Amino acid sequence: MSTNPKPTFRRILLKLSGEALMGDEGFGIDPKVLDRMAQEVKELVELGIQVGVVIGGGNLFRGEGLAKAGMNRVVGDHMGMLATVMNGLAMRDALHRAYVNARLMSAIPLKGVCDDYNWAEAISLLKSGRVVIFAAGTGNPFCTTDSAACLRGIEIEAEVVLKGTKVDGVYSDDPMKNPDAVKYDELSYSEILEKELKVMDLAAFTMARDHDMPILVFNMNKPGALRRVIMGEEEGTLIRAKKVI
């Protein structure tokens, strides 16, 4: 087990699913989970890590069901984007209560609620030690929050996209359904495609691959896992270009 005293990454993009904020509830935001996540992000800031955050909106709104019932997909996606803003507001508030400087930037202008997304300003804020939360996805329908995470990660020149999920990495099969599923420690982009492993949607994954953006999948519900990932300890599954030997 590595005991590297220095963080492996300097600037990260943390992607959290909206569902991660629910805790054991079936809907909404569990305040205890929110506060724990804010404390874990605070630990990173205290280590000198520059942190960008993208949060999904699935705990507050799911457009698929309404789309099947006849709602226009664009309308549903706009509602989903607003759900991510609500989660972003909650996270910003939790960080402020933990005495962490944080700014919320939305891809959709919401005057008086949060800042408009501005790439140059986001970089400046990160460099000054502020956590920047990116809300409203990419601002476009038909784009997932995973796509937004990869896009923002590439834009801010993050060294890695950390995808916090409910399982502790990428498995050969669904570990919830198959007890014999094998966990991978490291995979290449091509292995993910060959094995048809579900990490994120293809558009997001292809964007990360084309820009050589590593993705690290880990369990955000596991206390201390985020810090262990940052410190380069054996946690989660790292996906990157295959190293030339």
Curated annotation (Swiss-Prot):
UniProt entry keywords in alphabetical sequence: Allosteric enzyme, ATP-binding, Cytoplasm, Kinase, Nucleotide-binding, Pyrimidine biosynthesis, Transferase
Subcellular location: Cytoplasm
Superkingdom, taxonomy of origin: Bacteria
Residues in coiled coil: none
Annotated region described as Involved in allosteric activation by GTP, given as residue ranges: 23-28
Keyword hit for Plastid: no
GO biological process: one example: 'de novo' CTP biosynthetic process
Pathways involved: Pyrimidine metabolism; CTP biosynthesis via de novo pathway; UDP from UMP (UMPK route): step 1/1
Residues noted as binding UMP in the record, renumbered to the chain: 57, 77, 138-145
The keyword Transferase appears for this protein: yes
EC code: 2.7.4.22
Pfam families: AA_kinase
GO molecular function: ATP binding; UMP kinase activity
List of residues binding ATP: 15-18, 58, 62, 165, 171, 174
Reported regulation of activity: Allosterically activated by GTP. Inhibited by UTP.
Catalytic activity, reaction form: UMP + ATP = UDP + ADP
Annotated signal peptide: none
Annotated InterPro entries: AceGlu_kinase-like_sf, Asp/Glu/Uridylate_kinase, Uridylate_kinase, Uridylate_kinase_bac
CDD domains: AAK_UMPK-PyrH-Ec
A GO CC term assigned to this protein in UniProt: cytosol
Function of the protein: Catalyzes the reversible phosphorylation of UMP to UDP.
Family under the similarity heading: Belongs to the UMP kinase family.
Assembly and oligomerization: Homohexamer.
NCBIfam families: pyrH_bact
Protein name: Uridylate kinase
